[in-house]
Design a protein with these regions (language model features):
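Glycine-rich phosphate-binding active-site loops on the catalytic face of alpha/beta enzymes
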Residues: 75-85, 242, 359-386
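Rossmann-like dinucleotide/flavin-binding elements
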Residues: 540-561, 602-612, 628-632, 644-700, ...
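N-terminal capping/small domains of soluble enzymes
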Residues: 1-231
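Ferredoxin-type iron-sulfur electron-transfer modules and their immediate structural context
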Residues: 317, 374, 381, 385-536, ...
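Feature captures the FAD/FMN-dependent oxidoreductase FAD-binding
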Residues: 531, 536-538, 588-634, 720-728, ...
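Glycine/Thr-rich beta-alpha phosphate-binding loop at enzyme active sites
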Residues: 22-37, 246-342, 377-395, 636
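Beta1-alpha1 glycine-rich phosphate/pyrophosphate-binding loop at the start
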Residues: 453-463, 471, 500, 504-508, ...
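Catalytic cores of alpha/beta
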Residues: 64-67, 352-368
């Protein structure tokens, strides 16, 4: 494929918009229709119904992008920057992919990739289309939006003939061929609007934003602004760089918010516009603008240049945006608002989104433009929420920016949890397999769950208040809802698409609510047993793996006996995990549910020998846990964390002394630290870890609880020896980042000594190889036993080493399927699946206050992340007769290989490379390796198709080498989505 975009003609732009709106109720894939309430604000000699819109960038490069934004509620458009270097020359300088917006944003692209004349044509087309469609569809006042040019990067370039023609053409397009031709075509397409179309005002733009390169001298910036104010009489904004804050402040604020890994030095801070030069310059430009009868202000802010250190993008430098930039831009706004006493207009573009928009506006900062938020799932649809929130604001214009309010916003930003970097490295969001050509919508939460819980369905049942049915559905796959509702590692939450919106759905919390509210009903009518197998099964171990196996196999009809050497069931959860983390009553409830499946339990004694079990049972399931304790053995008084916790829970707490050191960084270490703090005589507990706190494997909430309860964290220390009440540790330091950006600890020659009466080692447990040998199990070279050896299965921690409860359950479920000979099947309750209408309503809506089930996006019903995140509308959703799930078609002609869609696909794939692709020409197809098709003859339905590595010509009216599903897909595109064909 090629990164070269092919702009739509005006006829294609307008006819597609009209056809799609009539058939689908959407415009270029945007369903979120905004209709103005009739109010507007005066700005730059015009009026805007909404004081926000897309920033100069990928969302204002093509005409369809701009029209899509307008439809969803945007009314102020900062058009993509135009400069003398353009077209193929500029495109060749941009590394691909060039956008990464999965958390804070990064890009390595800059001004328009079109030629300057092409850019002018795109903006003319978008302007005329909005004028026409706003009236035809009654979306708002056709004069209620504003286009704002963005030009750069030096005065000489701006004064070149092609740039001068661009600026003049935007100011008055009456005699431009692009304008007159579009007006004529529009009249031909919509003859009933001919009179209105002829009268469209050709004055497209009255304002400009100046963008300059880093290192541009203040004299150059002032000369550009003076020229545009004095010679062009344009309302002018100067875009400022965050470097104006100074290196020390920027580094300190970003570090405090968790962005300490973002790499930059001070050279841009030294070379860029300095604050002491900016203030007098802005005063002079304010005076000049007043004299010329136009307005002047600043645009805060430009993106922030940082170094590529972890292969984020294929360049050496990239530009940061989004929530991290908000932290810097708000401080810029606070300083400028204060020093200019609110008299200098501030236009904002630095990580704003729907949750911060109205705060900015009420403080007198507007117009507001956004980029990163609309590059995430929901895309342009996010504008509708912004419009609805703005609709609650007064449109009484402030005379000045409220400096106190802006200062408060800057200070609040520093502590805003939505702007902070996650305390742990972001988990892998994808599900570990490639995206299929068809039927790709999936629930990443379910895919991320080791037992593939029906997460969206039980969330939806809980949303409807149907807790008993929600728990009954949970219990089909999960016999331990109280345990997993309390201490599950919740891999599901790590995959949640809401990570790209605000915060993930708290799925574990909802599961626990379902368990509490639905338990009585479930126990009165537990899951029915089936007769799928008559096997006799012995389970050795009554922890989570053994309990789950007894439940799954018992419900399948097996005759199951569980042998547990302890007097109570529950394994490590019962014997080791402290009561303050999970109460025994919760474990008891799960055990009662498991017992309802009919297994027999033998407690308080060891299981019979392997030979005895072999004679009596068809299958043996080993679920005895990781039985070998790990110790440092470096001297001093040392306890194993598991042994310590087990003793304390049994009421046999040892004397620890005053000073306790816990070695390790997992949940067990946190439990041990919290438990030690509760022991009489203990004055302090120190958690020693050889990496940084950020890389501790413990759950963030467990780390936070340990810290709140008084545990002290000492990272980057590696224990060497313990004696005479002291622990000696080697000081570590972080080495250079690896390819993934992770910095491993490296030993130094420094040591520290800590007071330590007792050392508690939380280093994980090991598999008991001798125990496995008794059952004829031989581990592989890495020491890991096989899942199955003849009729013996190895489950949970015994197989994996220290693992999670839900991973142990996954092993049990896999053993059940192997013994039964078929996967677990069951009906989904009626009404458990979210409707597509409900899923559509939730797309693009940021919320952290709604009830958790309501925040579910229904990804398995309607994903479309790649559709909504694409700024160019290069991924289209195709509805096929007889299929509930829309299919994704990639449009090669609209794609510039920015790569943005790849960040949000739940699969290990890049939709712009891996989804079935429509090519406009055979030449385009030959430049690509995508599976896809070119229409050789539309009337005869002749296609040239590439399917994986095979290419062939075919006719859809005859038999083809393709599947019937793919034939139907292509036929639907030809006959019902002909407006996509160019």
């Amino acid at each position: 494929m090629s990164e070269k975009m092919s702009p739509l003609s005006f006829r294609q732009l307008l006819t597609r918009a009209l056809a799609e709106y009539e058939r689908e109720g959407s415009v270029f894939g945007v369903r979120a229709k905004y209709v103005s309430d009739g109010r507007s604000l005066p700005l730059f000699g015009g009026r805007v119904e909404m004081p926000f819109g897309p920033a100069a960038g990928p969302n204002t490069q093509l005409s369809q992008n701009i029209l899509a934004g307008y439809y969803a509620g945007a009314r102020f458009f900062e058009l993509k920057t135009v400069q003398k270097m353009d077209g193929a020359e500029l495109a060749a300088c941009i590394a691909r992919p060039c956008i990464k917006a999965d958390d804070e944003g990064y890009n390595c692209e800059w001004s328009t990739e079109l030629t300057v004349p092409q850019a002018l044509t795109e903006y003319v087309h978008a302007y005329i289309a909005i004028k026409i469609l706003s009236k035809r569809w009654e979306l708002g006042d056709p004069d209620g939006f504003i286009f704002n040019m963005s030009v750069g990067y030096d005065l000489a370039g701006i004064q070149t003939p092609k740039m001068n023609a661009f600026i003049d053409g935007m100011m008055d397009a009456e005699h431009l061929p692009a304008f007159t031709r579009a007006i004529e075509e529009a009249q031909a397409i919509l003859p009933d609007m001919a009179e209105y179309i002829r009268a469209i005002d050709p004055h497209i733009c009255r304002s400009v934003t100046i963008s300059t390169l880093h290192g541009c001298p203040p004299q150059e910036i002032e000369s550009i602004a003076s020229y545009l104010i004095r010679e062009k009489h344009l309302h002018t904004l100067v875009k400022c760089n965050p470097t104006i804050l100074g290196y020390d402040f920027a580094r300190k604020r970003l570090d405090a918010a968790g962005y300490d890994y973002i790499a930059f030095d001070d050279h841009h801070f030294k070379e860029d516009l300095q604050y002491e030069d900016a203030v007098p310059m802005f005063h002079r430009l304010m005076a000049l603008a007043k004299k010329e009868g136009v307005s002047f202000g600043v645009k805060l802010s430009n993106t922030f240049p940082v170094d590529v250190k972890a292969g984020e993008l294929p360049s050496s430098e990239m530009y940061m945006s989004g929530k991290a930039l908000y932290l810097l831009t708000m401080e810029m706004a606070a300083r400028i608002a204060s020093d200019f006493e609110g008299k200098l207009r501030i236009s904002y573009s630095g990580g704003a989104d729907a949750l911060h928009l109205t705060e900015l506006y009420r403080a007198g900062i507007w117009p507001i433009t956004v980029a990163t938020t609309i590059l995430k799932p929901g895309g342009y649809d996010r504008f509708l929420q912004m419009a609805r929130r703005m609709g609650k604001c007064s449109y009484k214009v402030r005379a000045r920016v409220d400096a106190r309010a802006v200062r408060a916003l800057s200070e609040a930003a520093a502590g805003d949890p939505l702007l902070q970097k996650a305390p742990k490295p972001l988990p892998r969001r994808t599900i570990g397999r490639p995206v299929p050509l068809l039927d790709c919508f999936t629930a990443p939460c379910r895919e991320g769950c080791p037992i593939h819980q029906d997460v969206p369905e039980y969330l939806h049942l809980m949303e409807k208040g149907r807790a008993p049915e929600a728990l009954a559905l949970i219990a089909r796959r999960n016999p331990l809802p109280f345990i997993t509702g309390t201490i599950c590692a919740h891999n599901c939450m790590s995959k949640c698409t809401r990570h790209f919106y605000d915060t993930p759905v708290h799925i574990r919390e909802v599961k626990l609510q379902a368990a509490k509210k639905g338990y009585r009903a479930l126990m009165s009518a537990p899951p029915e047993k089936q007769s799928l197998t008559s096997a006799k099964v012995a389970v050795v171990g009554g922890g989570p793996a053994g309990l789950a196996a007894a439940y799954y196999l018992g419900l399948a009809g097996a005759e199951v006996t569980v042998y547990e050497k302890e007097k109570q069931l529950g394994g490590v959860v019962r014997q080791v995990i402290p009561e303050f983390r999970i109460p025994s009553v919760s474990i008891d409830k799960d055990v009662r549910l498991v017992k309802a499946a009919g297994a027999r339990f033998v407690l308080g004694k060891a299981a019979p020998t392997y030979r005895t079990l072999q004679k009596k049972y068809d299958y043996i399931l080993l679920a005895a846990g990781a039985r070998k304790s790990a110790l440092l053995s470096i001297g001093g008084r040392e306890l194993n964390a598991v042994a310590f916790l087990k003793a304390q829970k049994a009421g046999e707490t040892p004397v620890l002394g005053e000073h306790v050191c816990v070695i390790g960084g997992g949940n067990t270490a946190m439990d041990a630290a919290r438990a030690a703090l509760r022991v009489e005589g203990v004055r302090d507990v120190t958690i020693v870890y050889r990496r940084t706190k950020k890389y501790m494997p413990a759950d963030p909430e467990e780390v936070e609880l340990a810290e709140k309860e008084g545990a002290r964290f000492l990272p980057l220390l590696s224990p060497l020896s313990a004696e005479s009440g002291r622990l000696t540790c080697q000081v570590m330091e972080l080495g250079a980042p690896d390819a993934a950006g992770r910095r491993s600890p490296v030993a130094t020659d420094k040591t520290v000594s800590l007071p330590c009466d007792t050392l508690i080692s939380a280093l994980g447990e090991k598999t008991d190889l001798e125990f496995l040998a008794e059952y004829g199990i031989t581990p592989d070279a890495s020491g890991r036993p096989p899942f199955r050896s003849d009729n013996v299965f190895v489950l949970g921690d015994l197989r994996r080493g220290p693992a999670t409860v839900v991973e142990a359950m996954a092993d049990a479920l896999a053993a059940r399927d192997a013994i039964v000979g078929s996967p677990l099947k069951y009906p989904i309750p009626e009404g458990a699946a979210m409707s597509q209408c409900s899923a559509i309503e939730r797309k693009g809506v940021l919320t952290v206050k709604d009830p958790e089930p309501r925040r579910c996006l229904g990804c398995q019903v309607l994903c479309e992340n790649c559709v909504t995140a694409c700024p160019n509308r290069a991924n289209a959703a195709i509805r096929i007769p007889g299929k509930a799930m829309p299919q994704i078609l990639h449009l090669d002609y609209a794609c510039n290989e920015c790569g943005n869609c790849a960040a949000f696909c739940p699969y290990d794939s890049a939709p712009y490379k891996d989804k079935f692709t429509l090519f406009a020409t055979m030449e385009d197809m030959q430049e690509s390796r995508n599976s896809g098709f070119f229409i050789a003859d539309r009337e005869k339905e002749l296609l040239h198709v590439r399917l994986e590595e095979k290419e062939f010509d075919c006719c859809l009216k005859e038999d083809t080498p393709m599947s019937r599903e793919l034939e139907t897909f292509l036929s639907t595109v030809l006959h019902h989505y002909e407006y996509l064909l160019v």
